[in-house]
Amino acid sequence: MVRTPCCRAEGLKKGAWTQEEDQKLIAYVQRHGEGGWRTLPDKAGLKRCGKSCRLRWANYLRPDIKRGEFSQDEEDSIINLHAIHGNKWSAIARKIPRRTDNEIKNHWNTHIKKCLVKKGIDPLTHKSLLDGAGKSSDHSAHPEKSSVHDDKDDQNSNNKKLSGSSSARFLNRVANRFGHRINHNVLSDIIGSNGLLTSHTTPTTSVSEGERSTSSSSTHTSSNLPINRSITVDATSLSSSTFSDSPDPCLYEEIVGDIEDMTRFSSRCLSHVLSHEDLLMSVESCLENTSFMREITMIFQEDKIETTSFNDSYVTPINEVDDSCEGIDNYFG
């Protein structure tokens, strides 16, 4: 449906309004009030279009129009209303008292819009420019870097999982090999002494500090064993169920979930192993004990052959490994 024009274009005056025309319009509106803009030009004796008369009155001649600079409250209201109505200036002007839609539009384009851009806000969406354009431009400008970074994260995660599984399998082998030997030696000590032994069970990680001190004090009283530093091992605590023959890394899946769990497991496992007199040695003596180092390296050699397809895989002796953190990680990685 086509809207009919408010008046005929023939004989109408266009361009700037004169002072005489303004006085005629003001006098007519004061006598008859606002409205009836289609018939007003003929009644007021004006050679203007009805729409032109309405806009001239609303934007310039209305007596309650507020002139001058916009206050901070008015600017905040304009920003909030623009976020709702967009560029519908007439709808915004109805919410701002004594301000015209044309004046609000001009103030938006010349002042408010520039201030929003300086603050990092998109004047169209009223959202942060960094949240939208910043992140998308970074990914679009460097798509290869972002994809490579994601691939590295996935690879590091997989390496950590493989490292945890291999470490658990290796610790299982060490505990299994030395655990059976300790059981055999402890039983031999029991038979040789012709009686039961006062045992000292290594406390687990769940034991409190008070119990540890009590346990350590009781250790000094158990001196009836011919074992170095008066430390004995409870044979029941090192039964065959303690050390599994299976090198399945899933056996310790819940224990070695992360680095801290691996550390606690290693301490608990080695506390049983190192309780035996053959293994009570300092770091220096361990390095000097070639048979001990040879057996540890042999265990690691067997583990590597089992997990790889090469039967001739060479493993550097453990006492020849660089003792730095990087060297240890490379050796067990």
From Swiss-Prot:
This is Transcription factor MYB122. Keywords: Activator, DNA-binding, Nucleus, Repeat, Transcription, Transcription regulation. PANTHER family: F14D16.11-RELATED (PTHR47994:SF5). Transcription factor involved in glucosinolates biosynthesis. One of its GO terms (molecular function) is DNA-binding transcription factor activity. Residues 156-166, 204-223 have a biased composition (Low complexity). GO terms for biological process: regulation of DNA-templated transcription; response to insect. SUPFAM superfamilies: Homeodomain-like. It comes from Arabidopsis thaliana (Mouse-ear cress). Residues 37-61, 89-112 bind DNA. The gene is MYB122. InterPro entries: Homeodomain-like_sf, Myb_dom, Myb_TF_plants, SANT/Myb. The keyword Transcription applies. Residues 136-155 have a biased composition (Basic and acidic residues). Expressed in trichomes. GO terms for cellular component: nucleus; plasmodesma. Residues 128-166, 198-228 are annotated as: Disordered.
